[in-house]
């Protein structure tokens, strides 16, 4: 909702101040003012940043500074640059996100690229992953981005290798099953699912616990040290048992 009338802006600012509620100013390519569009020609990063700071100035006139800025674009490079400009020009908290990112597959890729690039440079305070998918998957994706960047410590860091000629187990099925069953595990651990015993324990020696496939069987290892050998159909259960012990 866009409120520009001075009296209405003051009323909103006063009400939020009395209740200790921050105001998030959300800008996207479809919300830009005609004057700003005329100046830049199209929704550039500069246009998004100018619009957000303009709306912030409307609140600042009434001494309201409990503000969060959001400048979302469906183009990752535009979104990144807009937030970089805002970080240079103000000290307000920034809410990161790629708007209209798309379906689960492409949306996660675009959100990870945009949000991740900014967080790696210390830009951003809150995030939102927008997907044309089950909203629960948006939450999972957001947590996964934070875990991948070592910002969030709660939950499993899951690693698995691509299949190769040495793989003799159904690695894809096993990896998906393990990831799904550990999705809500809150332990700060790294779990590995590797395709072969030749490289598995060595490549994933930093994992707290892991499995490596053989021919109809596999090894369970901990910090690169082999614990035991189990049949392929028992690999997942054996791994989960070891996770419970950690």
Question: Which stretches of residues belong to each language-model region?
Answer:
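Conserved, mostly hydrophobic/aromatic
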Residues: 25, 69, 118, 161, ...
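Nucleotide-binding motor/catalytic cores of P-loop/tubulin-like NTPases across gene-expression machines
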Residues: 197-226
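Catalytic alpha/beta core domains of metabolic enzymes, predominantly
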Residues: 28, 36-183
